Design a protein with these regions (language model features):
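Glycine-centered tight beta-turn/hairpin loop motif at sheet-sheet or coil-to-beta transitions
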Residues: 60-62
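Cap/lid segment of the alpha/beta-hydrolase catalytic domain
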Residues: 99-154
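Short beta-strand element of the alpha/beta-hydrolase
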Residues: 66-71, 77-90, 109
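Alpha/beta-hydrolase fold nucleophile elbow
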Residues: 167-174
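N-terminal targeting or regulatory segments adjacent to alpha/beta-hydrolase or S9 domains
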Residues: 1-50
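The serine-hydrolase catalytic nucleophile loop
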Residues: 89-103
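Short beta-strand micro-motifs in enzyme catalytic cores
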Residues: 51-55
Length: 174
């Protein structure tokens, strides 16, 4: 058992791993500053202490990404912490009502539907073979720039930047 405590697998860790991700993050930062478009559509559920929005934004590669955004009412003069919540594999964001308790405690919540899974987000990637399962290996043959989850991670980062830039967000507590 001792030999497995430091086991690193049989695949070598890419020498340029950090450079690759730093370049990708820099591209997203530039996209955020110059091209990002997002849309918030208010939902009226009659909840006295919360505001609910459908939040759409253009993700990596032009995919339209959907998220549910719930914020406590009366946040104009306050800074609120945020939780970014994600669903399981082949899932979608949970129902609005299942998360209302979080917002009742003064915390904002955003739930992103991962592209290509069961939610409302769009997957505009072109992949050969199976698309219902196997997301983890989508794009492996084509190379790291085509990896499915690379774009998912970058969509997530982009969503975090959107949330971070709301005037009512406590940027230290996301």
């Amino acid at each position: 058992m001792e030999k497995y405590l430091n086991y690193k697998g049989i695949s070598p860790f890419p020498d340029d791993f950090d450079n690759f991700w730093n370049e990708e993050i820099n591209k997203v930062d530039e996209f955020f500053e110059k091209e990002l478009k997002y849309e918030m559509i208010k939902k009226d559920f009659g909840i006295p202490f919360a505001e609910c929005y459908d939040l759409y934004f253009n993700g990596i590669g032009g995919a339209r990404i959907y998220s549910k955004l719930i914020i406590p009412k009366g946040t104009k003069d306050k800074k609120i912490p945020f939780i970014l919540k994600f669903h399981g594999y082949q899932g979608q964001s949970s129902d609005w009502s299942r998360n209302i308790g979080i917002v009742a405690s003064g915390i904002g919540l955003v739930m992103m539907d991962v592209r290509g899974q069961a939610g409302k987000s769009q997957d505009n990637g072109v992949f050969d073979g199976i698309t219902v399962r196997g997301h983890i290996i989508k794009g492996v043959k084509e190379g790291r720039n085509k990896l499915f989850y690379k774009d998912v991670y970058l969509d997530t980062y982009l969503l975090s930047k959107i949330i971070e830039n709301f005037e009512f967000t406590d940027k230290e507590n996301i």
